[in-house]
């Protein structure tokens, strides 16, 4: 079952970047703030991998199939967050340029298979974001990763 969030993709990315920058940010806190349950799916000596259990329906008809949070075990290191498997309403270049402005030139994948990502970067307000586009569907945004600077 999909979880309905009142966020737009843009406000979600900005909120996640804000959370990343706060001391003590972790997957439990992210899930609590968003009101979603995150499940530990994998762990190694350095990182815990969390994901949402069901797709997130965002404002504007956008669906985030996966919220991937990588929580580092090293003290004081901010989690890495990826909003991926974007579906529903296609977010194309026109909207991206309206929301984000100038983007870096595309970086093609080293191995162009259908699931490979073409990446670009830009700024959403004060937040630096990486944008991923599927090789098989380069006109629609497939993922967004907020970064703290």
Task: Give the ranges of each region predicted by the language model.
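Short helix/turn-capping signatures at newly exposed starts of structured segments
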Residues: 1-107, 111, 137-140, 145-149
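Short, surface-exposed coil-to-beta transition loops
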Residues: 63, 67, 115, 125-130
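Beta-rich nucleic-acid/ligand-interaction surfaces
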Residues: 112-121
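Short, exposed beta-strand-loop hairpins at the edges of beta-sheets
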Residues: 121-139
């Amino acid at each position: 079952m999909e979880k309905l969030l009142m966020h737009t993709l843009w406000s979600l990315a900005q909120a996640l970047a804000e959370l990343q920058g706060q001391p003590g940010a972790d997957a439990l806190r992210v899930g609590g703030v968003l009101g979603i349950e995150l499940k530990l799916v994998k762990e190694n000596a350095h990182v815990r991998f969390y994901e949402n259990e069901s797709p997130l329906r965002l404002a504007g008809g956008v669906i985030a199939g996966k919220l991937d949070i990588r929580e580092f075990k090293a003290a004081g290191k901010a989690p890495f967050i990826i909003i991926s498997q974007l579906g529903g309403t296609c977010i194309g270049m026109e909207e991206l340029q309206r929301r984000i402005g100038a983007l870096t030139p595309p970086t093609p994948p080293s191995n162009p298979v259908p699931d490979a990502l073409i990446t670009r970067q830009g700024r959403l307000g004060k937040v630096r974001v990486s944008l991923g586009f599927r090789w098989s569907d380069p006109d629609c945004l497939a993922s967004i990763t907020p970064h703290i600077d």
